[in-house]
Design a protein with these regions (language model features):
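Small-residue (G/S/T/A) turn/hinge positions that recur once per unit in extracellular repeat modules
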Residues: 69-70, 76, 91, 99, ...
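Short, solvent-exposed linear patches
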Residues: 87-90, 115-118, 144-148, 168-173, ...
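Extracellular glycan-interaction patches encoded by glycine-rich segments
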Residues: 83-86, 107-114, 137-143, 164-168, ...
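N-terminal segments that cap or nucleate solenoid repeat domains
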Residues: 60-104, 150, 254, 359, ...
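Surface-exposed loop/turn positions within long extracellular repeat scaffolds
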Residues: 78-79, 132-137, 159-160, 185-186, ...
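Gram-negative bacterial Sec-dependent N-terminal signal peptides
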Residues: 12, 17-19, 24, 28-60
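Extracellular disulfide-bonded cysteine-rich modules/repeats
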Residues: 5-7
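Extracellular beta-strand repeat scaffolds in secreted/surface proteins
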Residues: 91-93, 121, 148-152, 175, ...
């Protein structure tokens, strides 16, 4: 093939060059020094044109190719169209302290170009600028189809444009930036484009990326970054939309340790469906600061914060973003995930936005954030685990199951502090669950509500010394579709809100058992509004306490505007200042005190305030009336019924007792006092309190047992003895018979 050669004078090198096609092929000598010196100039001046043509081979003087065992040193200013190091064989290019290499045109430079090739560029105090004469960034492929390595040390400086490590399938590219004032600047940085790429920044080395940084770009690629020992990577510019991607379609891993630093804008881990990304932040003073963190966008993402490592989030974070994605954050061994700034608008965390998300905090790990929501969208599933002493989440609110499924487990003295409203089962499709066990605690502060079952389903389970404390009201079953359940399971477990509303507009259930304690010293409402249905079961030596030394509220209301039911059984105890059953004319309330040592203790007792209320004392269950007064059917059109033993028309049961009462009074509604018990002894069931009231609708039913009235009763209405024996032990001179 005919070739055209031309001899030109290179002003930079001060030599004649014979140019042909695209590249200058440096001969197969072991060492070439490209430097500005009189000897080099004289040597080339003595060469004949034929020798110059022979040196040119099949390449052009526009590119520098270092290959076939060649080692080339640059310690002066040079400029080429491209740098090709390790084209088919092995090549080493050293850019030394006084060396400055730059580009003249738009060609891509390559280290480790073809299969089985191996190229190395060492920038040892020199400068390599990969921009053309028009200041346009040009590509550098490190490990194109072979193996490529770029080492930047001894205050070396590389101005990179588009840098790709492992740019083809099966190839390997590595960049090492080591030492203070050793610098790599890039615009687009792909670490593992199609093959395998590694970036190591150590000993205060410094790297910047101003457009995008990607680890594991294409499917089956692998990108790995280690930033350590004061190394730093800055991934940002004036545009906050710049992205740091870890595991785009391939596998990516970034590790920050021993004081390494990364600063980035939007960070995406596990970007696409095939993407697998991992971010590790470990050791004291190891920090990554990001604007927004997307962990598991379409793919799989994992964040590990450990050993005092720190992540600073300027705005929000989504973990398990899209349907089918999976994201995990592990904060352990004094690691810290911190959200900067104030307010809740940009500091929130979604664990399981539309995908599957996990947040695990253990071994003194710490999270400080805005509102945390687990199970945000309908397809989202979020799980939060906080365990071990001094492991803490502090946030502006906790939502479990917004429209999806959310669960939180607090154990082994782990702590969650919510300084804002919190909910379980927010939307109609939302399902939220919280388990507090083995000394775990959830505190809700700042005078805000906690709602279990807003419009969805919420469950709060407390056992083995778990604790819940709130500075305000807790609602169960807030909206009509809401279903809320609270289970307190043992003697060391407690639930301490200011007040509790069980079945506000929806359905609420509270079960307190095995010696557990529920404190709601403001008030307790069961069946709060017209559509509300609430049930509270206090059993097996457990306590519901509504009393304090304060004179404020402390009311127990069963059937406020809706339907309420309170069951005190097997030694359960309820203490309140005043107890009211069925407050509204359309409300309904039922209270049952059943069993030895079962106790309802209240100052005054109102059964059927304006609605239909029933109190049943059976099987030695006791009503202790500290204020001495019991009212039945207080206002029209109320119906208030007090059953001793069993209800009228039912099979007789063992009687319960009233202590410290001075009177039972029928109000202006309908009062009903039923004696249907099994005490048939000669002494009978003793009734010492006065039965009084001017309500002509008042009734005393005697269905079974032997009952003895000891007071001079003055009630109006009827006394109906259907069965059993009623003894009147009080007869006065003015004609009061004790039968009303």
């Amino acid at each position: 093939m005919n070739r055209i050669y031309r001899v030109i004078w290179n002003c930079t090198l001060q030599v004649f060059q014979a140019c042909s096609e695209l590249t200058l092929r440096v001969g197969k000598t072991s060492m070439v020094n490209l430097r500005k010196s009189s000897g080099l100039t004289t040597k080339f001046r003595r060469l004949t044109l034929g020798v110059l043509l022979a040196l040119s081979g099949s390449a052009s003087g526009a590119s520098l190719e270092v290959d076939n065992g060649q080692i080339t040193n640059i310690d002066t200013d040079v400029a080429y169209d491209a740098y090709l190091v390790g084209w088919y064989g092995t090549g080493v290019l050293n850019i030394l302290a006084d060396g400055s290499a730059s580009l003249t045109t738009i060609t891509t430079s390559v280290i480790g170009a073809n299969e089985d090739s191996e190229g190395t560029v060492n920038v040892l105090g020199g400068t390599w600028r990969l921009y053309d004469s028009g200041n346009n960034a040009r590509p550098l492929n490190v490990g194109q189809s072979g193996t490529g390595t770029l080492n930047i040390k001894q205050k070396g400086h590389v101005d990179g444009g588009y840098l790709r490590l492992g740019s083809s399938t099966g190839d390997v590219g590595t960049v090492n930036v080591e030492g203070e004032d050793s610098v790599l600047t890039t615009e687009l940085f792909e670490i593992g484009s199609y093959g395998t790429g590694s970036l190591n920044i150590t000993d205060k080395g410094y790297v910047t990326s101003s457009i995008v940084a990607i680890l594991g770009y294409q499917a089956n690629s692998n990108g790995k970054v280690v930033v350590e020992k004061g190394g730093e990577w800055l991934i940002k510019n004036n545009d906050s939309s710049i992205e740091f991607q870890i595991g785009n379609q391939g596998t990516g891993e970034a590790t920050i340790l021993e004081g390494g630093l990364i600063t980035a804008e939007n960070t995406i881990i596990g970007g696409n469906a095939t993407g697998i990304g991992t971010l590790n932040v470990q050791d004291q003073d190891s920090v990554i600061t990001v604007r927004r963190l997307y962990n598991g966008y379409f793919g799989n993402g994992t964040v590990n914060i450990s050993n005092n490592g720190l992540i600073n989030n300027k705005e929000y974070s989504l973990v398990g973003v899209q349907d089918g994605s999976h994201g995990v954050v592990n904060v352990t061994d004094k690691g810290h995930w911190n959200f900067l700034g104030t307010g809740e608008a940009f500091r929130y965390i979604y664990i399981g936005d539309a995908g599957d998300g996990e947040l695990n905090v253990s071994s003194e790990g710490k999270v400080d954030s805005g509102i945390i929501t687990a199970g945000m969208k309908e397809t989202g599933t979020g799980n939060i685990t906080v365990k071990d002493k001094n492991s803490v989440i502090t946030n502006l609110g906790t939502n479990l199951g917004y429209d999806g499924h959310g669960e939180m487990n607090i154990s082994n003295e782990g702590l969650v502090v919510s300084n804002g409203g919190s909910s379980l089962g927010y939307g109609e499709t939302g399902v939220g669950k919280v388990n507090i066990t083995t000394g775990g605690m959830w505190e809700v502060n700042k005078n805000v509500y906690t709602t279990i079952g807003v419009a969805g389903v919420g469950n709060l389970n407390i056992s083995d010394g778990g604790k819940f404390v709130s500075q305000n009201i807790t609602f169960l079953g807030d909206k009509a579709s809401g279903i809320g359940t609270l289970n307190l399971m043992d003697a060391t477990s407690s639930f301490d809100p200011v007040g509790i509303n069980v079945g506000n507009f929806g359905s609420g259930i509270v079960n307190v058992s095995n010696g557990a304690t529920l404190n709601s010293t403001g008030y307790g409402f069961i069946g709060g509004n017209a559509s509300g249905k609430g049930i509270v079961n206090i059993s097996t030596d457990s306590l519901w306490n509504l009393k304090t030394s304060s004179t404020n509220a402390q009311l127990l209301q069963v059937g406020v505007l809706g339907t309420g039911e309170l069951n005190i059984t097997t030694g359960g105890i309820v203490k309140a200042r005043d107890t009211q059953i069925a407050l509204n004319d359309k409300s309904k309330g039922d209270v049952r005190v059943d069993g030895q040592n079962s106790l309802l203790e209240t100052f005054n007792m109102y059964v059927g305030t304006s609605g239909t209320g029933t109190l049943t004392l059976t099987n030695s269950g006791t009503l202790n009336v500290e204020g001495g007064e019991v009212y039945l059917g207080v206002f029209e059109p109320a119906v208030g019924t007090l059953n001793i033993g069993a209800a009228h028309g039912e099979a007789a049961a063992d009687a319960g007792y009233i202590t410290n009462a001075t009177k039972v009074e029928f109000g202006s509604g309908e009062g009903v006092f039923v004696f249907n018990h099994t005490n048939n002894s000669d002494a009978g069931y003793q009734v010492d309190m006065l039965i009084t009231g001017d309500d002509k609708d008042g009734k005393v039913f005697h269905d079974a047992g032997h009952t003895v009235f000891n007071a001079g009763n003055t009630y109006s209405g009827k006394t109906l003895v259907n069965d059993g024996l009623l003894t009147i032990a009080s007869h006065t001179a003015d004609g009061v018979t004790g039968m009303g």
